[in-house]
């Protein structure tokens, strides 16, 4: 609003301030102006200015008061209606923790009392260290204990159990201690009963066996509690000998050897499937041809070069040679063979004509009979200069180098009997031939290969059919047909086993029934059946498989889902998980185990609180043994911050000696230690080495085996079998080497989410790390002395990764006595 100030006259006085005459005159003239209705301009302007001044002042004051009140009111309204909340729709989060948010009720007074009792009842050597007490008194739902070799974890686990049961009143049927093998289970039960007895608690054998379990002995009662499976048998436990219930749960599920009882079921399933499923028969044909077909030989091979010179001479005598060999097979009752039509077929070999003995229509392949090794090697045709065996060797070499047709070469009468089922659509037994999956070190009977491959896939938590569907192979790769046949066979085998009376099921199938893929099955379990999984303590956790991990997580989730109703009226409430392990001792990746679940424990087992304990004391070995083993394994991925310290009795530091393979030298050194009264472990990389070395240490073996079991001081085992053992002197025979690449295992490893992102060969990479861990396990068995004998590597295998590559020459804890190559 614009403001205007009018122009005022110079001076205009009020009447009261004027003299009388002027006042009278002003009134007169003013009255006249009124009568004339005229305006006195100066007076009007003066009045206007005076009114403007007084009106403006009053208006400003009034407007200020009015505007202030209105502004406050409007401001107050804006403040009240402003909504600063997030308008985006946000649903509740998912609670994926496996445990309730709780803590073990351990008061300071209880801890003090328990420590005093331990100091009073256990010898000084068995007193826990500070780290072990941290493990025993862990009050969080989840606890990960990194316990290196010789860390004294067993005693700590026993004291943890004692704390829960004796001092907190936890019922035994709410707890489970899981050990990895039958042997470790027996050892732990012995220690448990001894310690409990010191506190006046006599633990019965049955109670102890119910408490201390293997994974497999815990899952079996779960499945047997389901309707219709009360008498269920585990396929891995089948045997022709009578078994008690305890023998059954104590059997070794990791024994990959197929016994007669198991093979009968495999063969019966194979026969039915071969008879009824054309697709299965078609898938098998390339496998049979690949297995039985004569293996090719390069033409520049020395044997080929030598025998090419007599090609014409060999061709001239070939028909007579065929007659001679055929007569031998006929007299042995091995010819003719069902499914093979006896007929001669001519082959052009290096420009000359040779013959076969028959044709197999089922395989679309020609058949040649070989010279059975049981026949006399001096057998000679009339007038011939060479023996039949030598003539046949020449023919075999020429066929290997120059024959490109499908050809089956039967080397012996026994081989023909084993393979009889492969030649005919009428199968009366098993497949009758061996197969070698790429990446495996040796061939094995086909059905054994099926069991091993399916077991590996299922250990990774995968279904066989789904895994096979996700694989891919080259068009002509026989493994493509192997896995197609496996997929068909495995489903048929599971159906066949369930049809038996009583029904049969593999352990892997049992774990899958109660895995994270099938949470609804837990609704079928009673509280009493599920409750023992509430408070789990697991030893050797680094060797668990994805399948086992899925079962553990699903069980803990089911327990939390049931809530307080599962524990009404009981001292043991909620649930907990305590895992003890050493990722440096994870050595079972070849059958599907992985240290990933221990290394990434917090991620794999989400909990409101997790305690991490590092048991760094080593009560077994001196520092040189510890440092040598850790130097080898440190290149493998591991939990950060690991460094063991010798905590046993002070002793002289002997370096780990690395030597060239010398069986006589090994035997002499072993004898010296035995005569000194040392305990000895003789560890082999390959079981076949045991037979070789026993010849040179037979005298000591005989002396030791004549003693009572408790007095024996020599044990011979593979590296893998030695876990948990120790000796004064350890002899390692053989390097730890990664020799082959497995295409199918690399594929299923990726499917299972194992390995690093972007790694095309995750299984092979894991195995290269595992050979370092295997060497670590071998070395850390030694309390005082360790001798490592390795073969000189020649040929293609010499370039393969091996643990001894990491042996340094400039460290005091190693003494490399190998001759430089």
Question: Residues of each region from the PLM?
Answer:
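P-loop NTPase Walker
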Residues: 7-42, 46, 50, 61, ...
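Conserved helicase NTPase motor core
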Residues: 92-149, 154-156, 176, 208-215, ...
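Helicase P-loop NTPase motor core
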Residues: 150, 154-157, 607-611, 617-709
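Conserved P-loop NTPase-based nucleic-acid remodeling module centered on helicase motor cores
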Residues: 174, 179-317, 374-376, 385-445, ...
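Short beta-strand-loop-alpha-helix junction that forms the active-site gateway
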Residues: 352-393, 415, 490, 557, ...
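Conserved RecA-like helicase ATPase core segment
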Residues: 396, 546-652, 810-817
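A short beta-strand element within the Helicase C-terminal
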Residues: 716-750, 786
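C-terminal accessory regions
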Residues: 740-818
């Amino acid at each position: 609003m614009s403001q205007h100030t009018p122009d005022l006259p110079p001076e205009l006085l009020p009447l009261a301030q004027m003299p009388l005459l002027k006042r009278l005159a002003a009134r007169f003239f003013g009255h006249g102006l009124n009568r004339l209705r005229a305006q006195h301009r100066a007076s009007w302007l003066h009045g206007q200015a005076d009114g403007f001044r007084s009106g403006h002042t009053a208006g400003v004051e009034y407007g200020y008061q009015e505007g202030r009140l209105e502004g406050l009111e409007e401001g107050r309204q804006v403040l009240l209606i402003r909504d600063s909340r997030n308008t985006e729709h946000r649903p509740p989060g998912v609670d994926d923790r496996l445990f309730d948010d709780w803590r073990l009720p351990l008061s300071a007074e209880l801890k003090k009392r328990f420590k005093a009792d331990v100091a009073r009842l256990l010898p000084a050597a068995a007193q826990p260290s500070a780290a072990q007490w941290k493990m025993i008194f862990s009050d969080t739902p989840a606890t990960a204990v990194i316990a290196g070799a010789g860390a004294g974890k067993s005693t700590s686990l026993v004291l943890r159990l004692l704390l829960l049961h004796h001092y907190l009143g936890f019922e035994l049927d709410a707890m489970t201690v899981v050990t990895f093998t039958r042997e470790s289970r027996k050892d732990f039960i012995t220690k448990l009963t001894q310690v409990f007895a010191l506190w006046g608690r006599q633990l019965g054998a049955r109670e102890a066996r119910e408490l201390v379990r293997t994974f497999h002995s815990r899952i079996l009662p779960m499945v047997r509690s389901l309707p219709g499976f009360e008498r269920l048998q585990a396929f891995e436990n089948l045997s022709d000998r009578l078994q008690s219930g305890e023998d059954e749960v104590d059997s070794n599920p990791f024994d990959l050897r197929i016994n007669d009882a198991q093979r009968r079921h495999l063969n019966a399933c194979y026969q039915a499937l071969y008879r009824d499923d054309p697709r299965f028969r078609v898938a098998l044909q390339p496998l049979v041809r690949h297995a039985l077909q004569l293996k090719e030989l390069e033409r520049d091979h020395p044997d080929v070069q030598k025998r090419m010179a007599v090609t014409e001479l060999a061709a001239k005598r070939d028909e007579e040679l065929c007659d001679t060999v055929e007569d031998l097979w006929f007299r042995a009752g091995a010819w003719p063979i069902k499914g093979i039509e006896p007929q001669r077929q001519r082959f052009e070999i290096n420009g000359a004509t040779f013959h076969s003995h028959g044709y197999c229509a089922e395989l679309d392949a020609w058949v040649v009979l070989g010279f059975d090794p049981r026949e006399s090697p001096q057998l000679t045709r009339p007038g011939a200069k060479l023996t039949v065996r030598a003539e046949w060797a020449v023919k075999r070499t020429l066929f290997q180098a120059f024959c490109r047709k499908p050809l089956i070469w039967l080397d012996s009468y026994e081989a023909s009997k084993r393979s009889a089922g492969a030649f005919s659509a009428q199968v009366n037994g098993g497949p009758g031939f061996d197969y070698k999956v790429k990446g495996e070190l040796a061939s094995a009977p086909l059905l054994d290969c099926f069991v091993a491959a399916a077991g590996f896939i299922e250990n990774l938590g995968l279904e066989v059919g789904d895994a096979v569907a996700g694989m891919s192979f080259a068009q002509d790769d026989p493994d493509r047909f192997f896995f197609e046949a496996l997929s068909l066979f495995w489903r048929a085998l599971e159906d066949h086993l369930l049809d038996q009376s009583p029904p049969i099921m593999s352990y892997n199938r049992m774990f899958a029934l109660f895995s994270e893929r099938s949470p609804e099955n837990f609704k079928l379990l009673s509280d009493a059946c599920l409750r023992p999984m509430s408070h789990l303590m697991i030893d050797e956790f680094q060797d668990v498989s994805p399948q086992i991990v899925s079962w553990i997580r699903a069980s803990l989730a089911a327990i939390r889902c049931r809530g307080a109703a599962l524990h009404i009226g009981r001292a043991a409430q909620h649930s907990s998980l305590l895992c003890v392990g050493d990722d440096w001792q994870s050595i079972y990746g070849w059958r599907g185990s992985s240290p990933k679940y221990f290394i990434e424990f917090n991620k794999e087992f989400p909990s409101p609180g997790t305690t991490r304990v590092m048991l760094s004391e080593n009560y077994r070995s001196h520092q040189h043994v510890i440092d040598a083993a850790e130097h080898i394994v440190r290149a493998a991925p591991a939990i950060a911050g690991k460094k063991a310290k010798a905590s046993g009795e002070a002793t002289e530091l002997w370096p780990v000696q690395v030597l060239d393979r010398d069986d006589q030298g090994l035997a002499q050194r072993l004898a010296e230690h035995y005569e000194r009264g040392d305990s000895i472990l003789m560890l082999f990389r390959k079981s076949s080495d045991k037979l070789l070395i026993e010849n040179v240490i037979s005298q000591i073996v005989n002396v030791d085996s004549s003693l009572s079991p408790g007095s024996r001081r020599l044990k011979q085992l593979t590296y893998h079998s030695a876990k948990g053992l120790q000796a004064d002197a350890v002899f390692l025979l053989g390097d730890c080497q990664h020799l082959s690449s497995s295409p199918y295992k690399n594929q299923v490893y990726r499917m299972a989410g194992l390995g690093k992102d972007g790694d095309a060969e995750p299984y092979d990479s894991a195995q290269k790390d595992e050979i370092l861990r295997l060497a670590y396990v071998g070395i850390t068995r030694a309390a005082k002395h360790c001798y490592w004998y390795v073969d000189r590597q020649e040929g293609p295998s010499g370039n393969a990764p091996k643990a001894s590559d990491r042996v340094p020459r400039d460290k005091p804890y190693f003494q490399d006595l190998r001759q430089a190559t």
